Amino acid sequence: MNKLKLSLFTVLLIFSVGCNQQKKDTGSVIHIDNIVDLTHTLNSDFPFIPVRKLTYPFELIPMATLDKNGVEANSWKIHEHLGTHTDAPNHFIANQKSLDQIDLKDLIVPVVVIDIEKKASESSDAELTVEDINLFEKKYGKIPDHSCVMMYSGWEKHLKDSLFVGLDNKQVKHYPGFSNEAIKFLVIKRNIAGIGVDGLSFDPGIDENYTGHKTLFTAGKWGVECVANLNKIPKTGATVIIGAPKVGKATGGFSRIIAVW
């Protein structure tokens, strides 16, 4: 009888310790006080970089309806670089990672936001420069290793007008972006995971050679474009989660991007 009591006590003790450990482990996984959606809703009006015979607006095409088929379903007409989306390194560089090959640990990273809204309000061709990075770090501290650096230019306020693409009468685009020197600095000196912008491209619109894309992707980093609500997250201290679609050989894709802290 005493042996039975001892055995029961031992089992209960082990169970109790196990439950307490499970509670402890579960409670320490992650704690989120704030969450912000950094993704624009994609629809047929969403602007895109115009490339003759290549790019086109998003289209939602009904496939089935509840009335006719007993189920509601749509197909999408979409190219990889529409809406809030992720660019993979193979977008410009041969033999680099495709979207599905980007490691998950590189898609959940610290995020910092560098504000150039004042410059962008004065010039559509404004650039985020190394000087802007230095000024940011003097105020907020060094940009963390393996982080995402977002440029906030306030450009999303132009989403529904022609300034977002900024085509002039020679069909040259005008919108803010990172300078190539800034991207080089972030890749070499700060070992970033990726960068992002609230405009159409992280290269300024006037750079039709996409110099910054090539610099970033040669280093195997990713970029996100048309990011929303960057003015609603802290300049430092948040984590960004890049919900890039896992499509084999993709050079990019519409993504759900969120910030938490």
Report the location of each language-model feature.
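Intrinsically disordered, low-complexity sequence elements enriched in Ser/Thr/Gly/Pro
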Residues: 1-3, 21-22
